[in-house]
Regions:
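Short, flexible loop/turn elements at secondary-structure junctions
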Residues: 56, 98, 116, 189-193, ...
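Hydrophobic alpha-helical segments involved in membrane association or supramolecular assembly
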Residues: 52, 114, 118, 187, ...
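Extracytoplasmic
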Residues: 47, 89, 182, 223, ...
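N-terminal "assembly arms/tails" that initiate or stabilize quaternary assembly
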Residues: 1-85, 311
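Alpha-helical scaffold segments that mediate packing/assembly in large oligomeric complexes
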Residues: 99-175, 313
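Sequence/fold signature of self-assembling virion shell proteins
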Residues: 2-33, 149-170, 192-314
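Aromatic- and glycine-enriched pocket-lining scaffold segments that form the walls
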Residues: 175-194, 198-200
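Short acidic, glycine/tyrosine-flanked loop/strand segments centered on an H-E-D-like triad
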Residues: 77-104, 264
Length: 314
């Protein structure tokens, strides 16, 4: 007896583009740490390593920069430090039964792509956060030494922010710029930390900015030339007595990531009912997946990425 094989096609190209774009947009809504990184694309057929570049600053020398009339000075040499990082793939999927797809009030496949995009966005942002946590530039609240010595009273204060700014300035950290605003550093902290800061009279809420400047997603306010952005995925470690929180204050190009809108793109993978052949003989299952082709993060300059370790008030 002959066996009849029925071939079914996957998503139409227009639908594939739609789900890819939708998943990417939902992933981006979860980005906080990844938003301020130097972005790099991965060259195809170039192995699993991505190369980030950190240009080394020129040393100011007034005597060496004096020009002599009619004499062309010697050119300066560009110098850079290369930081290599190995990429990994990330992904997840859900199964959708034919009965659920038929009886549900909403478009299950569309909703699943949103949920998976949000999940992968959180995963990638936490990967960036965990890399930032490894910075060697650490400031402990109240002058304490080590996580184990942080007490409940060692909360984030305005003075700690001022100390962080002083350190970054001494390290010649490059500032961020944006339309209509002054150059600034960025601080990422959790809601409990901003709660402790916002009671200070020096805090400038975003609604009270004196100039019409472009603002970041999730921006809360400014303090001493630092723009504050909140994340609910902040790194927290318990030292046996209290939870020790990370608050990051940093300049531009302090760390880098893969640009997921480029070669490290997040992709929606939809296998519709009837696409599995003999593995699903009654066409009962469809799957919706999210896959990130390649992603990694790396610290490019620890001196420009400072982590304040502190407790938070109850």
């Amino acid at each position: 007896m002959a066996t009849m094989v029925t071939t079914t096609t996957g998503l139409a190209p227009t639908m594939q583009t739609y789900y890819d774009r939708k998943m990417l947009e939902w992933a981006k809504t979860q980005f906080v740490y990844a938003n301020y990184a130097q972005k790099r694309s991965i060259p195809k057929n170039n192995g699993k390593t991505v190369q980030f570049r950190r240009w080394n600053l020129f040393t100011p020398n007034a005597a060496a920069q004096i020009l002599t009339e009619g004499v062309t000075p010697d050119a300066q040499n560009l110098s850079m430090t290369e930081i290599n990082a190995t990429v990994s793939q990330y992904g997840a999927y859900v199964e959708v039964s034919d009965l659920l797809d038929m009886t549900a009030m909403d478009n299950v496949i569309s909703d699943s792509s949103e949920l998976l995009g949000e999940q992968m966005g959180n995963v990638l942002d936490m990967i960036v956060r965990d890399v930032m946590h490894t910075t060697t530039n650490i400031q402990y609240a109240n002058g304490k030494v080590g996580d184990n010595n942080i007490a409940a009273s060692d909360v984030l204060t305005v003075d700690e922010i001022r100390k962080a700014v002083r350190t970054l300035k001494k390290n010649k950290a490059r500032k961020f710029t944006r339309k209509g605003g002054k150059p600034h550093f960025v601080c990422i902290c959790d809601p409990s930390a901003t709660y402790d800061l916002q009671s200070d009279s020096l805090w400038q809420d975003v609604s009270k900015y004196s100039t019409a400047e472009q603002i970041y997603d999730g921006e809360l306010g400014k303090l001493f030339g630092v723009v504050f952005v909140e994340s609910t995925n902040e790194k927290v470690v318990n030292n046996g007595t209290v939870d020790v929180h990370d608050t990051f204050v940093f300049g531009a190009d302090a760390y880098g990531t893969i640009d997921i809108a480029g070669s490290g793109a997040i992709k929606a993978i939809v296998k519709p009912h009837g696409s599995s052949g003999t593995a699903d003989p009654l066409d009962q299952r469809a799957t919706v997946g999210a896959k990130v082709a390649a992603f990694t993060a790396a610290i490019l300059n620890s001196e420009w990425l400072l982590c304040i370790r502190h407790a938070v008030s109850a």
